[in-house]
Amino acid sequence: MARPAAGPGGISKFGNDFGLQRWRNTPRYDQTQPLEGSVCGYGLSNPFHESLFSCPAASWPQAKLGRPNTPQEPSKDLKRILSQISPKRIEATIRKLVSFGTRHTLSTQTNATHGIGAARDWIASEFQRYADASDGRLTVKVIGYEQQPDGSRVLFPVRISDVVATLKGSEDPERVYVVSGHYDSRASDPLDYKTDAPGANDDASGVAVSLEIARVMSQRNLPRPKATIVFAAVAGEEQGLLGSNFLAQTYRNSSTNVEGMFTNDIIGSSTADDGTKEPHVIRLFAQGVPPLNVENQAMREKRLMIGGENDTPARQLARFVKETAENKYTDMQVSVIYRLDRYLRGGDHRPFLEAGYPAARFTEPNENYAHQHQNIRIEKDPKTGKDIQYGDLPEFCDFDFISRVGKVNAAALWNLAMSPGMPRNVRVDTSDLSNDSKFTWDPPAGGNAGVGGYEIVWRSTIAPFWTNVMDVGMVQAATIDLSKDNVIFGIRARGKNGERGVAVLPFP
């Protein structure tokens, strides 16, 4: 179905209410194909959005300086990486993890073919296989701790193990980016550690992405990333984000500079329970205002005063993903969702956020809850009388879709690791009233060695993504003839290779 034409002033022909209700009640456009074109560069497809962003006020204030902010073109090396991500390898990984029966955190850790211990050992051996072929680039560790009973989802003492593969950076190795999936699974009862729980989508799919990107990026015929990339498979997610919390706290306790973390959790299918398919869309959940243990009350009040609640480190990270990973090479649209997670759900990005690190969650666009946290069974649908297959089985995974999600992750991670880190102590001068904007900043934590210059980006206060950019050169202070009252600004570093980093919101 073609998109509806717009009437005068860009108002949808669905009516002056922007057609919200009628849009929901009409057939969807063809969601089996990637979207062609976009609105204001945001890839929006709903007539409500088309109306909103085509109105004259949407582009105010019209800056007469700088240039439009455009997506970052993948480098030659990144194109090679994306071309090698294999749906067949991803499928093989998922089926292998399913073969262990259950991967419940409380299941056996001593059986060689069944339970979470067997899954852990196999994942570690796969990472090690890639490490052996990497000429020393990739190193593998299994780290963990003894979790005591918690009166909730941990019935007895159990070892929580994270499998961590590290691709050390060549120029700025102390700057770290993490990608993870959780390898534990569960059945209907979160305490049932004996019933088979295949966990194909939740979350063998996420583990498969970590493994596949590690395989490709660690190859000897590719340059090392400038910053360090960590590929992790964590346990205990279903029992309370245990493995991810341990990993995040391990980094925090060692003062590791983690500048970005992604978890891939339930990325196995684009098909909803009503059959709706969106195979070229992936959701990315990004938290707003940080928790108080990360940003104190005074800082929070300042953020709210300047209208910075939509410009937290997590959301800047999500904007970066949108700008670098939505292209013809990934064949995906990144739908950024401005909230921590879905309702009633949680994910492994949360412990990283609570540790003070920018983090976000990738999740499929449509979920089928008959295929999550369910014992394998067939039941009659009380409405239709048809049989419903319950259970998180491989047959419900779309391996081509998962590989495209892997490409989105790879594009984001490679661009992050090849660009400079985030500028520090970014400030806007509010010492007096003026119609221009004065900024100062310090170099990234790794210094200016890989920096080729700095850029000021901005957008209107109602726009979700950066729309304009000005190159200000190799300086640490700049004044721009545009009022800080009317737009949202960010400062980002640009590498000598042209790669642009993550922007940082200036505070007074």
Swiss-Prot record:
Cofactor(s) the protein needs: Zn(2+)
Domain of life: Eukaryota
Fibronectin type-III domain boundaries: 422-508
Residues that, per the record, bind Zn(2+) 1: H182, D202, D265
Co-factor binding details: Binds 2 Zn(2+) ions per subunit.
Stored SUPFAM superfamilies: Fibronectin type III, Zn-dependent exopeptidases
PANTHER family, A to Z: METALLOPEPTIDASE M28 FAMILY MEMBER, PEPTIDASE M28 DOMAIN-CONTAINING PROTEIN
Name of the protein in its database record: Probable zinc metalloprotease MCYG_04217
